[in-house]
A protein has these predicted regions:
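C-terminal extensions of enzymes
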Residues: 76-139
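Glycine-rich phosphate/ribose-binding loops and adjacent secondary-structure elements
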Residues: 1-74
């Protein structure tokens, strides 16, 4: 929120893309990031889990599941790239569809229509930090 407002205040929002990362695991998280002003999101862990779907069992019980997906992993040769690509594709497809459904439920047709006014929280501290509505506020 602060970065978005800073870019707008400096009148450079149209020249600099705001990319948000960290803690974005599911499409609901992605939508929140866009509502808070992100132009794009970077997902790390969730896509690694997606591409490793059903392959994460290969290194168990002696090695962690990540050993198949890391380029330097001890079991990188056991990773099926074709399956990983298919699982990643499905993750992106289902995430996009879930976001489309959520947008329709909010009466919106585009991510560009999202704003922080679409968000509400029951956490008073978060409401102040993110400058969004607080649900338990008495009127």
């Amino acid at each position: 929120v602060r970065a978005y407002k800073h870019l707008r205040k400096r009148k450079v929002k149209n020249k600099i893309s705001l990319i948000i990362s960290g803690g974005l695991n599911v499409p609901g998280d992605f939508l929140k990031a866009f509502a808070l002003g992100a132009d794009a999101i970077y997902i790390g862990t969730s896509i690694l889990y997606a591409i490793n779907h059903l392959q994460f069992l290969k290194p168990l019980p002696w090695e962690p599941p990540s050993e198949t997906v890391w380029a330097t992993g001890s079991m990188q040769d056991d990773f099926d790239v074709e399956k990983g690509a298919e699982y990643g594709y499905r993750f992106f497809l289902s995430s996009a569809e879930e976001m489309r459904i959520a947008l329709r439920a909010m009466g919106k047709t585009s991510l560009k229509e999202l704003s922080s006014s679409d968000l509400i929280t029951y956490d008073e501290t978060l409401a102040k930090m993110a400058q969004i509505d607080y649900s338990l506020q008495s009127k």
